[in-house]
Amino acid sequence: MSTDTMYFNSSRLLPSAGRNKTNNLIKQKTRNNRARGNAAKNANNNNYITDIPPPQTLPNGQKPNFGHSSNKKPSFNQKKHSPPSSPSSTTTLGKKNRQNNKETPRQNNKDDTRLLSQNLKNLLLNQKQSPHGSQGIIPMGCNGSAKKLSHSYAGSTFATNGPREAKNLPKPSFL
């Protein structure tokens, strides 16, 4: 007797349906029952009543602003980083500022930033247009004396520590 036939008729095995019979099909659980059960649980949890506190007011009668909301709506038509077209554009007041005729510190900072960036731009343009130009880097010699040696190579000017370094530089082919 083989081991297969030994356990085939054993009383320990539970009777089971054949492979192709419908008893083996898994019945799918309906989702409606689960959804209803969760809705009932949520309804039971939300039965208690909460007291809503009265709205806060400051001593001057205004509502507090904790930095999460602003009275201004952002304008998408203006570019953030566009430079002012004329000096009068920095002094032009917005619609709300015309009514209140006040400037907030943030607006003052924006104007200061524009003014500083315009001044820096003018300074850099004036340095490039000046006849003196940049004189190069002044390297310090071994004895502490400053020697100014600038060399031009392929359209760029750079400083070297001495004439020996300049001799080792490759010569451009067009010279």
From Swiss-Prot:
Residues 100-113 have a biased composition (Basic and acidic residues). The modification N-acetylserine is found at residue 2. Residues 1-113, 155-175 are annotated as: Disordered. mRNA-binding protein which stimulates mRNA decapping by DCP1 and DCP2. Involved in the regulation of expression of multiple genes involved in glycolysis and gluconeogenesis. Belongs to the EDC family. Residues 1-27, 58-77 have a biased composition (Polar residues). Residues 35-47 have a biased composition (Low complexity). The keyword Zinc does not apply. InterPro entries: PNRC-like_rgn. One of its GO terms (molecular function) is mRNA binding. GO terms for cellular component: cytoplasm; nucleus; RNA decapping complex. The modification Phosphoserine is found at residue 82. It comes from the Eukaryota. This is Enhancer of mRNA-decapping protein 1. It is found in: Cytoplasm. It comes from Saccharomyces cerevisiae (strain ATCC 204508 / S288c) (Baker's yeast). GO terms for biological process: deadenylation-dependent decapping of nuclear-transcribed mRNA; mRNA processing; nuclear-transcribed mRNA catabolic process, nonsense-mediated decay; positive regulation of translation in response to stress. Keywords: Acetylation, Cytoplasm, mRNA processing, Nonsense-mediated mRNA decay, Phosphoprotein, RNA-binding.
